[in-house]
Amino acid sequence: MELQTIPNNISLANGDSKGVQLTFKNIVYKVDNKKYKKLVKKQEKAKKKNDTESSTGDMNTGVSTTIEKELTILNNVSGVIEKGELVALMGPSGSGKSTLLDILAQRKSTGKITGQLLVNGKEIGEAYKKYCSYVTQEDVLLQTSTVFETLKFYADLKLPGVSEIEKIKRVEQIIEDIGLTKRTHSKIGGVLPGGILMKGLSGGEKRRVSIGCGLVTNPSLIFLDEPTSGLDSVAALQIMKTLLNLTLKGVTVICSIHQPRPEIFALFNKVMVIIKGKMIYSGSNILEYFESLGYPCPNNTNPADFCLDSAVEIGEGERYTEICNQWQKIWENELLNEIEYPPVNVEKPKTASWGYQYWILLGRTWKDFLRNQGNFVARVGTAVVTGLLFGVCFAGLKETEADVQKILGTIFFLITGLNLTPFAVISLFLSGRTLFNAERASKIYHSFPYYMAMVTVETLIVFLVALINAAICYLFAHLRWTAGHFFFAIMVYFFVHLLSDFMISTIANLTGTSDMTFAYGSGLSVIYMLFAGFYVPTNELPKSFGWLHWVNPLFYSFVSLVVNQFEDLPLECTRPNIPVGNSTIQIPCQFSNGNQVIEYYGIDDWTRGSSFGVVVAWTVFFFWTSYLALHFLNKEKR
């Protein structure tokens, strides 16, 4: 079976021969050996216990010399990829093919890397990223966006200096190139947060959209990690034909791939094989080369399977080092005859401003919220239902001493209800984080504009939920209804809901799983509710637990609302008169005005403004903890 041969003089669709040659020389990649670290700790403990140095280890560390400090994943890997080639990067699991792909795409964020990476024979540093694009194995796309909107989003953020008309033309051309013209305005689809299924594209079509996202910047190099993984045979072949068509326009495509079917394997015009971190072959005549090594391909055998099986056999055999050295010499000789290309323009890629990023992200986030109708209905519907339930349960309250406890209960349960509401959208936080990680790894936008866009939309939703919930309850329960008191109460409920949102978001970004977020969040919320000042007044709490009031945002929320409700409020005493001899006397009331209620709960030192200020401060605190956790703890490690 012969591999495809693409001529070197292919021109692009726009007539500009912008293809580039990629050369990588002596790539070495090492990572820390965890076993080594464990051994160091173990022997350090032994030293302290015995107060003597281990006789079997290094003189300085006491570490056994049979365990290396670093593991070598790639060892002097070199190769040349010409423009317009479709390259298969093959090898068994753990051979280092995905690692090499990440290094070539400059996406490796861990370990130590040495070697050279040249474009048209020159090192171009940071500008290298302008020429390449990377498509991950998983299709991480926003389910509620259409194909056009997805590609336009990438165009808006990655082509900031291009006019709107040119961006649209570029997107339409990409859609045509990936064969999705008839699906231009179809939604991506998939399982939305909360388990709702939205109909959309097939798996193969989603993969083509992912490839299209990588084509927005008109790259010269495209790297794909297992592009056919998880697809059926028909969809996989369609994907590879799409990639082959791109090479005909001068684009160089490098794929890591595992055991492709014969029809797919025949599309590649170069195959690179890595075994145990070393390159043992790179070229277009792999079957002939393996036959020269004594590994002829049997008839009626999948060539890809044969190559992989032969590579594994070589890696386990005695000739492994000999064959690796032999190939190194062949490569060095071929390097002398390497095709020369003109130097590339090393202009640094442009990036959109934070303000522009925020605007584009805000538009997408708002559309996503409106299209996820299940989420919208659930949140607003819950606000209406809980507001009605609270209102009916506490309906017709009066400004009397007898109803003081019911009024306090209404206020407290409104606070706790809004504090617990964010638990219903934990899946939203986590699904958004997955998309964010994938897009930030592609250098589309900075984390802060993304976060602010999410916060803006969430703030509007939170305000709506708090307004509906509190307004219904206040209307039914007849709480203090003057404009000033009602507006202040709405603002407190709004900030309670918002700070709870930020708190749950912080925990979600710290833990990364819904189960852990729910466990930690619910535990913290229970503590907040218990020490909010309703069940146990401040002046009755044991001194050893007093600090739990002062670090509790729900306490300050409760204080501000109680002061707002009862300050300078006269309370009618409705206790009955009882006969005493020939006359009657009225049982004295515990409270004759609202100030006595405030004093009874030990919060008379607080004004509604000062306590509300602390609530705002807590909201700001959780706002920043959520962002910092998102920014620093959610970076993709490869």
Swiss-Prot record:
It is a multi-pass membrane protein. The keyword Membrane applies. It is found in: Membrane. PROSITE patterns: ABC_TRANSPORTER_1, ABC_TRANSPORTER_2. The chain crosses the membrane at residues 376-396, 410-430, 459-479, 484-504, 516-536, 544-564, 612-632. Residues 58-301 form the ABC transporter domain. Residues 374-633 form the ABC transmembrane type-2 domain. One of its GO terms (molecular function) is ATPase-coupled transmembrane transporter activity. It comes from the Eukaryota. One of its GO terms (biological process) is sorocarp development. This is ABC transporter G family member 12.
